[in-house]
C-alpha cells in the first residue's frame, strides 16, 4: 500500500505467500504449495532459485540475527507396554508408568551419544527434551499397563535421525529388560536440517537493510527451531529467516511489538530498493 501511495516502482518485484499449518508439520501449508508448484508447467512456476526468500518467523530483540541454518527436528514416540492391574495388588502387574519414567531419564542421556558442538547455533549442541505425555489410566486405583511419551530432538547438521533412533533403542532396551516391559520407539515426525550460505545474495541484502534501519551489525546464526524456510531450502531455494522479535513464543505473556513490525516493513522495503 505504501509503495502504491507513493507511486514507487521498486528495483525488485514483491511476492507474498500466506500459508496455514506451520505449527503442525506444514502438510496442508507450504508443503502443499510446493507440491502443487512442482506440478505446474515450467512457464507457470513462480518460485525461482535466483529470487530472495525471507521468512519472518524467527529473530532477536535487536534485529541483529539472520537465521541461515536450522537443526534437524526429530520427534521420537516412546510406547511402554506392561501389565495393567488393580493398584492394591501391584505384584500382579508391570507398571508401565514407572518404566516410562525410567525411559524418560534414559532418553535424557542421549546427548552423551552425540556430543558434537557447533558455535553457529544456540545452544551449540544437539538437544533431547522429553515433552508430551499421553494420558494412561482414568482412575487413581489402576496400575497402568501402557504409557506413551514423546522426545523433542533438535539435531545439529550431520547428526542423522536414524542414528538417534538406534541410540534410543539401545538405551531403552536396557530399561525394558530391567522393568520387565516392552518398549517401542519410533520417529513420529522429522524435518531435516537445512542451511543457506551465509554469503548468499539474500543474506547480504538483508544485512545491508538491517544495518541501515536498525543501526546494528547483522550476523548469520543457526537455530534449533523449525521454520518453513527448511522446506524452501530443500527445494534449492535460498531462504533467510529474519524479523525483530522478543522471542516469547509458546510461553506466558507471548507478544509482539507493533513498533518492530513497522520497522521490519522498512527493512523489507529497503531490500526491494536494492539493485
What are these regions (language model features)?
Residues 1-69:
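Acidic/histidine-rich catalytic neighborhood of metal-dependent amide-processing enzymes
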Amino acid at each position: 500500500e505504501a509503495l502504491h501511495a507513493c507511486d514507487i516502482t521498486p528495483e525488485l518485484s514483491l511476492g507474498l505467500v500466506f500459508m496455514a499449518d506451520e505449527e503442525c508439520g506444514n502438510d496442508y501449508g507450504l508443503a502443499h504449495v510446493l507440491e502443487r508448484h512442482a506440478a505446474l508447467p515450467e512457464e507457470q512456476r513462480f518460485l525461482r532459485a535466483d529470487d530472495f526468500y525471507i521468512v519472518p518467523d524467527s529473530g532477536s530483540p535487536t534485529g541483529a540475527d539472520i537465521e541461515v541454518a536450522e537443526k534437524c527436528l526429530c520427534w521420537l514416540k516412546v510406547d511402554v507396554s506392561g501389565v495393567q492391574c488393580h493398584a492394591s495388588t501391584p505384584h500382579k502387574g508391570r507398571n508401565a508408568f514407572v518404566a516410562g519414567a525410567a525411559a524418560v531419564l534414559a532418553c535424557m542421556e542421549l546427548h552423551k551419544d552425540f556430543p558434537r558442538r557447533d558455535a553457529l547455533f544456540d545452544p551449540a549442541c544437539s538437544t533431547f527434551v522429553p515433552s508430551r505425555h499421553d494420558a494412561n489410566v482414568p482412575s487413581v486405583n489402576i496400575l497402568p499397563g501402557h504409557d506413551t511419551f514423546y522426545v523433542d530432538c533438535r539435531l545439529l547438521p550431520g547428526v542423522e535421525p536414524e542414528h538417534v533412533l538406534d541410540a534410543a533403542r539401545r538405551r531403552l532396551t536396557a530399561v525394558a529388560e530391567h522393568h520387565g516391559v516392552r518398549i517401542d520407539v519410533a520417529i513420529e515426525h522429522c524435518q531435516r536440517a537445512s542451511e543457506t550460505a551465509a554469503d548468499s545474495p539474500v543474506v547480504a541484502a538483508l544485512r545491508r537493510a538491517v544495518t541501515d534501519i536498525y543501526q546494528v551489525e547483522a550476523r548469520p546464526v543457526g537455530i534449533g527451531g523449525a521454520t518453513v524456510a527448511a522446506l524452501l531450502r530443500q527445494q534449492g531455494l535460498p531462504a533467510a529467516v529474519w524479523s525483530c522479535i522478543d522471542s516469547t513464543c509458546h510461553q506466558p505473556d507471548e507478544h509482539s511489538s507493533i513498533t518492530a513490525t513497522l520497522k521490519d516493513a522498512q527493512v523489507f522495503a529497503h531490500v526491494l530498493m536494492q539493485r
